[in-house]
Every structure is written in structure tokens, then in C-alpha cells.
């Protein structure tokens, strides 16, 4: 039975037992305490804790994609070196929320293992908690008593945290055979590999209080987990997950790419790559992007670890992106979004590979130099330089050292990292998030969530349910001249959410509404009052005219999203947005900058849609029905059971709770004002419509008139072309003066970057001239005079600090220096090292620009 059969067999088995199949939740959970979804129960956590009501039906089954890399649950270091550690894996599970309990859970598990998987009974063993006589006796109905083992809390008691739901658990083990495993640890309860845990059944029957006391839950629940990779290996008679059909096709592809056959004993690098490409593909397909911190940095670490293992196999060029096709081929049948995102994922992987490969050789050279001097502990300073200059994550350096039996000075690395973060934040001042300490829980318990009526009305009379000061503490009144927050029973003011800014307006005869925000489900308006108001007052509310402009920009954002997916491809996914009365901003997944032709096509698409005068239509639909109708939902967004669906003619259909136009013609004109990069794989478009677009056009007309007046012509383009010709002639003359000043620039992320040695001239003046020529520039020049080296760097609109740049170059040349972030100078004296300094300075800047 192959892996697809195991997955489908499991889900279909529990479907036949009345369980509803729940699709795999996103790898990025809606849970601030977790980096990634790392277990099958994570999507159901709020149900187990009672934060949300139990679903109907209250029994579910799923095959959940999981990642364990970074944070508390981190398997990264072991991946490739053991038979069963993975960063990415699939967890099969069945769940009961206060419905069936131990008897049925045990019976279902036994039936599936013996009747569906047909595992031999004489290879199966079971463990229970030492105090769980009930589970022991229930198992004894199915399996011999001498095959049931009792263990303590460490092995057979599960809890979500220090407090909350918990209970004993029971595990099913598979005996892989004494003929294959016969170490002293190969016994039930030992640390050997002979007895392999394949299924864990958690009996959530207690609530643990802060004092450690266990109290029975009124409705005990079931949470189970079975690793697809382990079961697949067993079904195929393999002793390592990597030898199964889940991984061997990927390992075979790696062997083709490096031209070397795979063998298990020396194949750690093959296994690392085959595991890591699964994590990388799924995370990118679900919208995570490479970044300098958080989840995006974990993603970068995983890929760079794989690239380095490719380097060990002799692969010195981008190759990981080529494996994306195989992952999609193997898993796209069940996870169909992989096929839709494949092209974009490949491009993002390829670009990230190029970034790292640009510095890996220099980084490895530095690593090996330090390694030669290391006896036990590798320098933390060098590890930090590898991270900061060459893009080597700390765990990659530690991984390389582990192969040599050495360790890195993590304490020193952490110290340097903390110093860097402190410098970065030195200028920041903030008051913290006062809203986190507000009296919201009390308001929710007393009133529940208040209603928003602004879809249908912009004016109404409403009653004050509660007042809060600006620290979000409850007060009975606000006096004349004071400001604070108001909770109305029903409010026409839209609270900021989904990228749409909050409404403003007025309270007739009382004061102004400055902002509207949503806190813990409560719609609260910030007000400034001219006379006293108190709890219980009934007031006249009016939303400002800005609402209409906000609605136009919000609807234009939907049309823009549709245009991007139509012109660039369906891989485009929203990565963020901001909608205001005079502008919109839309962030989206796309691997490279848009061309001027693409921007023109997008702008035309939106304006053509506006000209169609199509009606806007909103419907309230069941979430699944909405998705099935073709409505676009944000990946990973948590939606209610019933959702609001907005259709703009036949052009756009999305889930959206914001406010919109009645007809797309209200949008008027649409202009794109800027396209830029946000991070690796994420682009941003800024645009205007309606009155803001008209104001922009008026501004252009005024500027054109001013240019015509300055050039003293009614045909400014003719004059401009003439001037451009004259400039071109002057440049040619300058170029002919001599090429000693010529700089070969490289374009990286829209920045011109160059490092060069010049023979003559004033290097500061040269830098100033280049700053005037380019919108975004990073340049470092060196000049030798009488065995001394002058260094100068200039930076304009680029993520490099000139002071740091000249310092690193000067250090190589036995000198020093520094200066501002935009301009700095230094000196050196080691002339024979000047070529090395040029190379290192170039790589330093390249890494900074590529990872910006």
C-alpha cells in the first residue's frame, strides 16, 4: 500500500465512522504561541480549550501538514542523520469533541491497523498510562494482555500546557523485528529502533488548575496522531522513512543532479535535501516568504542548509528549484494549490539560491580559515560575521561544525546579535500596546459583540454601552475637551480591519469621531467631545464623507487583485493591503519586479473594468459554498461559518467584510503611482482612484505647463529630446577623457552597485556625481597614492551603511575609518590586499542588497 493509499484509506475509514474530513490547515497557524503548525491537533486547539463551541458534527478527521523547525519543537539538526526526523511531515488524526471516548477510539484504532492496514497482530504492542485501568481493560478485548505495557507520566500522559485540558495517552507500537534490531535498547520502552510508535491516542479527560490539581472534564475528548511517513515506511517494508516512496523519487532526482549514486550510509546530504525541499515548497506555496526574521527566516535557514548540502555533493549552481516539480508531481494530487503556485515557488527558490550562492564560496573560505585555528570552540565573532556578511544562519555553521565534532561559541554570537539589534532599535521610542491591558473581557461578558450597521446606513441614533479612557480603562463619563473610546450598542462606523482604515465622523452637537478600531471583537470609536457624555446616552451618529472614497479605493483594490492574477498568473496571492480615502496599497506574492508593459496592462485592465459599469453584489454564504463558487479567500485567514462575498461584475469575486461601491463606475479613473519590492518574493503596488486620481492628473497637467514655460515651448517633448541629445554628447566627451574613472555597475533590486579602484581624480566628487545620476546607488571607490590607500563609499536610497562598508574594506587593508550612513571614508596601507578588499566589499554589498 503506497503513501497516497494510506492517506486516503485513513480519511475514508473515519468518514465511514461518521467523521467529517477537515482539510489541512495552514502551516502558519492562527496562534501567536506557535511558529508553525506542528501537530494535527493545532487547528482544533481552541475547541479543546473551550474558547470556541464544538463543531457539528463533533467528530473530525484530517491529514494535517506540519513543520518542526525552529521554536520549541525543532527537528532541524537531526534531519538527514536519523531514519525518522523531518522538518515537514503529515499527521493523520481523528478527533472527538465530547462525543465518543476511549472505548470507540481504541476500537477504531485496532480495526484500522489490523483490518485496513492489515498489520500482523504478532507485531503489535500497546502502552497505557500506569494508572489507566480502563484503557488497559479495553485494549485487552483486542490484544493479549502480555502485549500491553504500563508506563508513567513521561511516556503516557499528555498536556497542552501547565494548565488546561490534559489526560493519559495510549500508544500503538510496531515490532520491526529482532533479526534487524538487537541492541541493548531494543526493548519495549527502550530507546532503540526495533519497536516503532505508529499511533498515539490522547484521552483528554482532565482539567489541570494552576495549583496542579486534576479535575474531570464534563465532556472528555479524543485527540490522536499517526505519522504518515512512518506508516508508509512500515507498509513498504522499509526501516527508514527516507527509503519509502515518499522520499526516494526526490532522492533519485538529487542523484541525477549531482551525478553520484545514492547510498544510505553516506547519503545524509541527499536526505537533507529531499526533506527540506518539501518544507520550502509548501511554505512558499502557502504564502510565507524569505525574510530576515520570524517564519521567513526559518524558511531561509532551511533552504540555505539544503544548498550547503548540495555544495557538499558538488552542486555549485541553483538546483533546489528544479526539485519543486517533483514535489508538486508527488503531492499536488491531494494538495492541489501546489500546482497553481508551482511556477512562482520555483522562481522564488531560484532567486534565493542565487543570493546565497553569491556569497557561499567566500563564506566557506572564512569558515575554513577559522576552522584551522579551532581546537574545540569555534569563534562566536567569526560565526556572527558568517551570518551578518555572508548570510550563513547560525545553525548552518553549527551543522558544519557538528560534522567535525566541534561546537560554536553561541553565547558570544548571541551577544553580538543582541548588540546589533540594540543599535537598530536605539532610535525607537514607543509606549507599548495599551490595548492589551484594556477592559475588553469585562465588556464582552457584559454586552457581547456590538453590531455594525454601516453596510446599510451612514447615520443613526445609538446608545452608549460603555466608555473607556485612552488607556482602555472603563470610565462612567467623558468631560468636555476629553477624548476616549465609545462602545455603541449599534454603530455605523466601520472598524479598521482587512486593510480598510477605520471610519471617522461626527456625533451631532457633541464632538468628533477620530477613528474606529476593533478590539477583541468589539467595535470601538475614538472620540473627542465638546461637552460631557456618559454611559446610557443616546446620540446621533454620522459617518464622514471619506467613507465613500474609502469604498472606491477598496473596490479598486479588488479589481487590481483580479488584474494581477489575470496578467501575472494565479500564483499571485494577497500578502497585505491598506485602503484609505486618498490611496491604496496592495502587497502580493510575485518573484520579480513588474515591467512597465505589465504595469500598463494592469492599469488598463482595471480602467476597462471600471468603464463596464458593472454592478457590485454582496451575498452571505456558507464558507465552503463561497470557496466552491470561486470566491478568493486569503490563505490562512480564519473565517466565520458564514461569510460575506463581494462580486464586481464578472471580474472579481472575493470574501470581504469591508465597505464597497454599488457600481464599479463610481471608482472613476485608476492610476498606479508606484511599484516596489517589500521582501523576497513580495511586491507592492500603490495606486489612486476617484478624486485622488483626478488630483493626480491635475498635478501632472500643472507640472507639464511649468516644464513648457521653463523650456519656452509648446512642445516640451521636442525640447527634451534635444536636451537629451546634448547630454549624451557631453557624456561621450567625458567618457573619452579616459576610462580610469569608469565604473562597472551591477543592478541589484533596482540599485546600482559598484566597487572599483580608480587611478586619478577626486573620489568624493566622483561619488557625488554618481549620486546625482542614479536614484538608488551603492558605490565604494579605492585609490592608491604613495603606498597609501584612500577609500570612500556613498549610498543613496539603498539598505547599506556606508560607514560599515568602508570599515570592512579598511580592515582587510590594515586600516580603519568610518562616517555617516550615506557617506564615509577610510584609509589603508596593505596595497597587495587591494584585490581581496574589492572582492570582499563587492560581496558584502551584494549580500545586503539581495537580502533587503
From Swiss-Prot:
It catalyses: tRNA(Ala) + L-alanine + ATP = L-alanyl-tRNA(Ala) + AMP + diphosphate. It comes from the Bacteria. GO terms for biological process: alanyl-tRNA aminoacylation; negative regulation of DNA-templated transcription. SMART domains: tRNA_SAD (SM00863). Binds 1 zinc ion per subunit. It is found in: Cytoplasm. One of its GO terms (molecular function) is alanine-tRNA ligase activity. Its main location: cytoplasm. Its EC number is 6.1.1.7. It holds the Pfam family tRNA_SAD. PROSITE patterns: AA_TRNA_LIGASE_II_ALA (PS50860). Zn(2+) binds at residues 554, 558, 656, 660. GO terms for cellular component: cytosol. Keywords: Aminoacyl-tRNA synthetase, ATP-binding, Cytoplasm, Ligase, Metal-binding, Nucleotide-binding, Protein biosynthesis, RNA-binding, tRNA-binding, Zinc. Its cofactor is Zn(2+). InterPro entries: aa-tRNA-synth_II/BPL/LPL (IPR045864), Ala-tRNA-lgiase_IIc (IPR002318), Ala-tRNA-ligase_IIc_anticod-bd (IPR018162), Ala-tRNA-synth_IIc_core (IPR018165), Ala-tRNA-synth_IIc_N (IPR018164), Ala-tRNA_ligase (IPR050058), Ala_tRNA_ligase_euk/bac (IPR023033), DHHA1_dom (IPR003156). Coiled coil: none annotated. Signal peptide: none annotated. HAMAP family: Ala_tRNA_synth_B. Consists of three domains; the N-terminal catalytic domain, the editing domain and the C-terminal C-Ala domain. The editing domain removes incorrectly charged amino acids, while the C-Ala domain, along with tRNA(Ala), serves as a bridge to cooperatively bring together the editing and aminoacylation centers thus stimulating deacylation of misacylated tRNAs. Catalyzes the attachment of alanine to tRNA(Ala) in a two-step reaction: alanine is first activated by ATP to form Ala-AMP and then transferred to the acceptor end of tRNA(Ala). Also edits incorrectly charged Ser-tRNA(Ala) and Gly-tRNA(Ala) via its editing domain. This is Alanine--tRNA ligase.
